[in-house]
Every structure is written in structure tokens, then in C-alpha cells.
Amino acid sequence: NGYNIGNFSSYISLNHDRTDGHRPDSKFHITNGFAKLGYKIDDHYKVTGDVSLAKFKNQNPGEITNPLIDNIMNILRGTTSFVLENNYGKTSGALRAFYNWGHHRIDDGYNPGGTPNPYLFYSDDHNAGFLLYQSFRLVKGNSFTVGIDYKNWGGNAWQDSINGNQNELVNKTVNEVAGYVIMQQDLFDKVS
């Protein structure tokens, strides 16, 4: 559903799908949504933001000759971003920020006649950061951009047992920062 009035714009959608699968223990369902809002501040600036979420659960029945019971994945994924853009003709740029994340709960399942797993696998992950840049076009055929990027990504994974004990598998976060200067020059309307 999209909606525009004056300098304001929006788009929102929601979806749900499901199936019982083609075999026992092969169900799947997903619910996801997306929303984007925008506002034109004036002739030079506009701001936008969006968020997307997906929650799904699926079962893996295993091979026909080696079936599985309770091989179930529960997953939540999300992403969001914010952008402030400027455009003055000969110069333009933006501040862009983003955050992506996920939470996973997985049961590896067991074979018929076997014993259920004494633990579940869990993991959380993230990827966040921002970009700040400005481009200048002061001479015909020439573009000069200066900017900085920052990113923080990582996650952790663990096993959670039915008796309450947890076994951490990994927990790591990485920070990255990069500044840059880029110049492009068109040559003979063919090469840049």
C-alpha cells in the first residue's frame, strides 16, 4: 500500500504464506512486513527510513530413507535504514545508517526411534554502520567524492540444553572504519 501527500511518501506491505509441505514434518510458514517513509524537507534535502521484518519457521523431514523428526528452524530477520540526502546540483551527498540483525533457534532433529537432542542451537547476528559522503562536480566531466564508512558486524552462537546449561560456541564483534577520496574524469565522452 503506497501513499503520497505533499512532501510525504509512504509504502507499507504485509504478507503471510504457509504450507503443510509435501511430507509429514515438512511444514513452512513465514510472516514478513516492510515499511518505508520519506519526506522532502526542501528543494535540497530529503529524508527516508525503512524497516523490514521476516519471521519464519520450517521443518526439514530429512531424506525419505532417513527421515528426521523435529528438525525445526525458527528464524527472525530484520533490516532497517535511515538516509538523509542533499543535492545542490554541483554537489550532492548523504548520511546513510543501517542495521541488520537475526535471531535463530534450530533443533537438529532426530531419527525415528532415536532420542531427541538434549540441546538447541541458537545464534544472533548483526551488521550495522553508517556512510557519510559528499560528491562535487565543479568541472565538466569531473567528479570528486570524499567520504567515510563505519561498520560493526558480528554475532554469537550457543547451545542451550534442556537442563539449563549453555555452551557458548562463538561471540565476536568486528569494527571497520575507512575513509576515501575518489576522483573520476571523463575522457572523450568514452572513458571515465
Annotate each PLM feature.
Residues 25, 168-171:
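Alpha-helix capping and helix-loop boundary segments enriched in small/acidic/polar residues
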Residues 162:
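Gly/His-enriched, cation/cofactor- and phosphate-binding structural elements
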